[in-house]
Amino acid sequence: MNKQPVVMVVDDDPDILDAVTTILSTQPYAIVTARDGLECVDKVRAQIPDVMVLDLLMPKMDGFAVVRELRQNPKYASVPILILTSVREDASRRRYELETGLAMDVQDYVEKPVSPQDILERVRNLLESGRRETDSREAP
């Protein structure tokens, strides 16, 4: 029997964390949550997720630093990451974040608000692409 895919959701906004968790709980996923980047990295060390949904702007350790930390370690470097973020500041700040987010080594990027169907589809696509990558590495 296949194990449930582990999806880690990282956001400092408890309402967003609860909303994304509720959306993902409609699927057969094991969901792990973290409220900041430090907690995220600690939890990844304990259990490597199959996909991560990551906010960028958080206290203690932001999403940019989380991505850098994970990508530096071969054990965690292949975890697919969906950046889920919003910027309430001016357009120049928003543009900076979008360009920086897209330049990072992540698989997908979406701005809040996002529809439940969009989150589910993006996570499903990342899980499928992650499985294909794992299968190709394990093939003789």
What positions do the PLM features span?
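Short hydrophobic/Thr-rich beta-strand motif most characteristic of the beta2 strand and flanking loop
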Residues: 28-35, 43, 110
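Two-component/phosphorelay signaling modules centered on CheY-like receiver
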Residues: 14-32
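Active-site beta3 strand of CheY-like receiver
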Residues: 47-53
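Acidic catalytic/metal-coordinating carboxylates
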Residues: 35-39, 62-68
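Active-site residues of response regulator receiver
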Residues: 55, 85
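Receiver (REC) domain active-site loop signature in two-component systems and cognate sites
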Residues: 58
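Non-catalytic signal-transmission and effector/linker regions of two-component phosphorelay proteins
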Residues: 1-6, 117-140
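Alpha4 helix (beta4-alpha4-beta5 surface) of REC/receiver domains from two-component response regulators
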Residues: 65, 88-110, 117, 121
